[in-house]
Structures are given as structure tokens and as C-alpha cells.
Regions:
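PP2C/PPM-type serine/threonine phosphatase catalytic domain
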Residues: 1-142
Length: 142
């Protein structure tokens, strides 16, 4: 199977782009795409997104050969966010935060994951968008 992909980020209304993207090409049929977006109102969102994205990918590379099981993606995210918490604690407890969204392609199977309000969309020609994740944010609280 041939896979082609592209990426694009934009800072939107903010002065700084706090997005961080990683793509792991594990072999010709397995790809991991991860995007983290630093949370507005928190300290150093660009650093937060970089830490979480890299820690998630590090966990993935270290453990993927054991195969994907039910809690694999959750454990990768937990390890990544724990690393971010340790960094925040070293900075005397400043609030650091980021969203994360991604997809793991294994042949014809795709696993989608996300936490926060970063979305993943699935487009299929000629139908257009056929799937969209739901945000994990209650906007009535903001």
C-alpha cells in the first residue's frame, strides 16, 4: 500500500503557533501521526506540546513491537502527560497543558485517538468528511 500525507498548522488568532507534529514511519505499512496543540492561558504551550508529542512517540517506539492492546494508546498518553507534569513541577508548579490527537495506521486499519479539543477528520472521496471526533471540552465552563 502506498501512503501519501501532508501537514499544515496555523496559529489562528494567537501570536504564537503552539502546534507540534510528529510522523513516525515504522515501515512501509505502519505510520504514527501525532499532533499536540498547547493550551491557551497556560504557561509555554509550545513547550508543552513538544514535550507531550515527543514523549508519546518515545513510548510508542519503545513498546510497539509488543503489539497494540486495549490500553496501549491510553498508557502512551498517560506517560506523555506525566512527563509534562514533572516538567511543570520543576518549574514550581506552573500550569502547562496541551491537547493531543493522532492516528496509527497499520495496513488497512487505523486507530484514532485524541484528548482535548484538537480534532481528527476522515475524508473519503467523493463523499467528503465522513467522520469527526468530538471535543473533550465543555465550552459552557469557559
Amino acid at each position: 500500500m502506498r501512503v501519501a500525507y501532508a501537514s499544515f498548522t496555523e496559529c489562528g488568532r494567537r501570536s504564537e503557533n503552539q502546534d507540534y507534529l510528529r510522523v513516525l514511519e515504522l515501515d512501509k505499512n505502519r505510520f504514527l501521526f501525532v499532533l499536540a496543540d498547547g493550551m491557551g492561558g497556560h504557561h509555554d504551550g509550545a513547550c508543552s506540546s513538544r514535550i507531550v508529542c515527543n514523549a508519546f512517540c518515545e513510548y510508542w517506539l519503545k513498546h510497539i513491537e509488543n503489539g497494540i492492546h486495549e490500553d496501549f494508546i491510553s498508557e502512551a498518553a498517560l506517560q506523555a502527560f506525566n512527563k509534562l507534569k514533572r516538567q511543570a513541577d520543576r518549574k514550581k508548579g506552573v500550569k502547562m497543558g496541551t491537547t493531543i490527537v493522532g492516528a496509527y495506521m497499520d495496513g488497512c486499519r487505523v486507530h484514532i485517538f485524541h484528548c482535548g479539543d484538537s480534532r481528527c477528520y476522515l475524508f473519503r472521496n467523493p463523499k467528503g468528511c465522513i467522520f469527526q471526533t468530538c471535543d473533550h471540552v465543555d465550552f459552557s465552563l469557559t
